[in-house]
């Protein structure tokens, strides 16, 4: 189109960038003087600049790009390439901008005497670039597509056009407007690189004139201009092609770079071009753009912007987070961009609607169309977000031409303004919202002079490489455009236009034409929104515009914002398949009874211990129970208080035969809570079995406790239940502080079971029952089996908590059907995979109760079970288990990890609607409240009519068939979600303001917990707020409490302990931490702000029951360390802490079991951990029992004997000739000694290469081990595990190493004083055997790093460097024992080699206590000693505290040796002249002087220059822990001192 004028406030198009960073001490320095504005020839030099200059706001150069350019210059290359770095996009805003492409063309232009190429050509004037130009220039350099900011237009010209005269007019335009002949370059004036604009003396517009024979050529030329790369350093920023088809048919193709012109400038350009061409008039020079940029810089320097900056700081003081993507986005999160791929959709708004928009704006708001469009967009964005945010920030573009003179200037003036909006108030009309928006924007426009990038720096806006700062959606409003223009006697008509692309998510462009029409376009990033998404936004915007012109006074919330077509389509997607058969008229117990008659001998239910009931037996016992229940009077409710067992199933089926209502209770819940349930449902009876008789009697009250029958009745009992009767009542957490009972009918249950069977094509399933009985999944599993002719397998309580045992049970029973939460499945598949792989019948894994974990997908696929299908189910208890389901793994599943895991389409006979706040349907892709209709909707809440009425509402969208069947109610879930285009549901979470959450599948009302805390505190807690921290298995409840003013601080621990003990809540509902706060945060409506609550800081109150807790012992510190690895948050732990009270749960207990095994090598049964949740009790499980304690009874002969493969290697071994250059195998390279040893090896001239084996941490790289590039070239890492039989090396690698290596240094080991020998055998002894065999086969030296601790086995005062084979260790000293065994193994091999006459250098190195530096010596080593090293810690904290522990009775002799000395000694031995002596050589790396504790203290005092305080050991350790000493180290140190008082230690001797 042709742009002619802009009559409003000139809101124009814009360019926005994202952020990153880069810096370096090398910068471009551009020569030239600001005192000589003319005839300047800037020249490029490379120099060093103070690193501090990088933090200057004017610095526009990226260091890494400069390094590349420097390298290119040295190599004689004139151009550089910017490295792909997604982070560097922030450089502009820092302004640390990258410099690649722009300078390279100039470097090849003109040779010079000094070899430094000059830029061309000379300039008339030079001035700093504007802020907007800097923004464009940086992006031009940074983005990979240099055509991003090209603007291209094509016109058809009818009439006798004179191409040469038109070309002359273009050149005249360049004379009039300096911006059309401006070059852009960097100059380091004032020592900092800055972007300058140089005004060239002549036009640089590239004009071509062609005669063409086809309109196809027009398209080709247009594409060429569109894709042209403009040369900014040479001022070549515009390209024109004049094409003649016939004397009266012409085409004009015009292109330019956005840095030279903005949209308003294009209007000025066209107007001036018309005048010059039509009249031949020579127009005088227009006002200069460079004067504007100079004024802009001066305004910033003179603080002219201060008032406006203060305004923006005030208005944007509480910025909202970046706007979420709309739900219909193609991706779940934004990504950093280095190119913009933008597409768009457009629609013309006819004169009729356009006139109404103008009239409405004027009459209703006294304003213009622009403000009405902006208000409509504002409301649309809130609706599309589903009101997920109450605050948003939108951008508008401003022409930046407040000065009248600027209306004549061609240049880059456009600016962008951020506008923060709040959601409309309840009941607020559009009229009022329009007035509010107009006032807000008009005020903002008075402060529009501040450049966008100055505003960002001043506000210190947090940058991200993935989204635009401040706003992600912009409204670009244009006025006065026309499709046609006059060129002399010719008419020019717009054919097409390609605008510059932006990095914004979305740009809404509104163009107002002089003929009264409007054109509305929505432009967006292709990777974010598809064309359908853009079209939906556009359609919705037009709909709201139509609405407000008809009903401007209507409340905003009542405005219809989506078109009827999209709503109708959404309703169609919301409804599942409708199927109604004769079975829907039956109850599930009828379906069960039918199979009992047909196949009475089939197994119906069985326990893990082998007990089972056939269908006939189960029917008989159930009917006997039904008979007994029929004899009783009272309500139909029957409470079942049984452990999961055969009795439980007999109870459920018997209750249903009797036509009664099943009410399950979890016997592990507090008795007070169970009593509340009994009082609410007033049961006819409470069923129990032997294990629960006392509980049942205690709960009974007026009810009758009935034992479950152990035998069946002789005659049949007729089924009393019908589809309209209540099948069960499940109690869930309630907001009033009491649990609420959900009433589910037999019709609801039948609907669910049949829908599941149809959707998942279920047959005769073997179903695992492992859910809690009070969970709806429990009922689902029972009748998935019994109503489908299958078998139910009951997992006992102890197996339910152990994923390995559970998986084993599944494999034994050949389970086909499971129902669990994501967290439960994660543990099952991670820890029980080997057993699950044997469960070849496994067909259906249903996942529900919490968000599906995408990490489960590869885990399930790795099981390689071809028949297995994994399903994601969604649905609350109130709709009978589930309403939607999606196959995730299987033939028709997603089968890949993805950010978006849908819940699937509605099940048969269910409807899943997404409704807005007015309970109206929204289109697919728009979030709203999930509301469920159909045959599974429950009957309401027991004894709670008000809550029932608010949550179970009339379904006005129900089909006629649904209404006829009585399915005319809708359950409002309070969950947020949206529908995909295929009708699949995506669950987003809870609606704003909801206090309901899910904790590992269990529904929790936070209000209930808060009420219980206040009620239980005996008045000491005035108010409480509870929130969830973490996700899935890591989710914990955190409580924040406001205390009565007179509550003493020192009583907080006892208060919290009291609350933890007495809260009448199930364990999963008890907070794991309590924090005292002065007040709780509330939102503007006065409600508790849970989002703000979760961000409150504060130290959790320790839960103590002892005012003077004893320090933790060694085992307790080990356990505390394990707890901290698995517990979320920062729990305060003591010996009396309970794992479940500080954030633990049964799923984390599984993780804890593995961590304990990793730390100690001891496997503790889950049942033991579960039954002893206290810290002290759990720690006692780590103490070795006498019956299992490892002693010298270990068969050391067998342990250290030579294996057949090792003997074979010895038989064929021969000495390999030494080489001047050696390749070395090294283990333990990442450890304290290993790192130093590695550095010395790499630096040694004889070492050709170092092969580091068994690098366990996959994140370790060559760069992390050495910063020297020459050393890195000599280094190869092999990630693996010492415990692996071949150190994780494959045969090919072993063979390759065998042919290359000349030396083996085995320094690696698993260092743990907690683990027994049997645990350390594999990593410490088997690894020695493998490497020893490799050395013998190759015939090369073998050096083994043992420990000086083995000499203590001798019991002698001193011990020389000789064998200790005659002093076998106790097996419980695992680390020492493993080193002794390796020494003995090496000795046996050396003796066997000697018998064959083969001499291989075999050396055992025994280092004493290795330290970074010895006491009394200056300096430090580059390596840091292990954090858990006892002696190092003792010395380190003695230095820090200038305090020493009292050591009476401790006969320690401190033998410290520096790490550098040990490494040098090993290297000297390995690379020095070989010892000709036979057998194993022993080397002691120790200090000649052994220090007593007194001597050590004196050394440290002399080193520090002061006297150290001496305190008893317990006090010293307490202080050290406060200074940071690890608790386990502290406890071990105390334990060592206590156990070793009076013990005589063996000193290491240096000579034999």
UniProtKB/Swiss-Prot annotation:
Which GO terms fall under biological process for this protein? Answer: amino acid activation for nonribosomal peptide biosynthetic process; enterobactin biosynthetic process
Enumerate the InterPro entries for this protein.
AA_adenyl_dom, ACP-like_sf, AMP-bd_C_sf, AMP-binding_CS, AMP-dep_synth/lig_dom, ANL_N_sf, CAT-like_dom_sf, Condensatn
**UniProt keyword annotation of Cell inner membrane present:** no
Q: Name one Pfam family in it.
A: Condensation
User: Could you tell me which residues belong to the region Condensation?
Assistant: 129-564
Give residue numbers for the modification (O-(pantetheine 4'-phosphoryl)serine): 1146
Chain residue ranges for the region called Thiolester reductase (R) domain = 1226-1464
Biochemical pathway: Secondary metabolite biosynthesis
Q: What induces it?
A: Expression is positively regulated by the acurin A cluster-specific transcription regulator acrR.
Q: Which GO terms describe its molecular function?
A: 2,3-dihydroxybenzoate-serine ligase activity; phosphopantetheine binding
Residue ranges, annotated region (Adenylation): 594-999
**Origin: domain of life:** Eukaryota
Write down any Gene Ontology CC term.
cytosol
Task: Cite the PANTHER family for this sequence.
Answer: FATTY ACID SYNTHASE, NONRIBOSOMAL PEPTIDE SYNTHETASE
Q: Which family does it belong to?
A: Belongs to the NRP synthetase family.
Copy the domain comment. NRP synthetases are composed of discrete domains (adenylation (A), thiolation (T) or peptidyl carrier protein (PCP) and condensation (C) domains) which when grouped together are referred to as a single module. Each module is responsible for the recognition (via the A domain) and incorporation of a single amino acid into the growing peptide product. Thus, an NRP synthetase is generally composed of one or more modules and can terminate in a thioesterase domain (TE) that releases the newly synthesized peptide from the enzyme.
Q: What is this protein called?
A: Nonribosomal peptide synthetase acrB
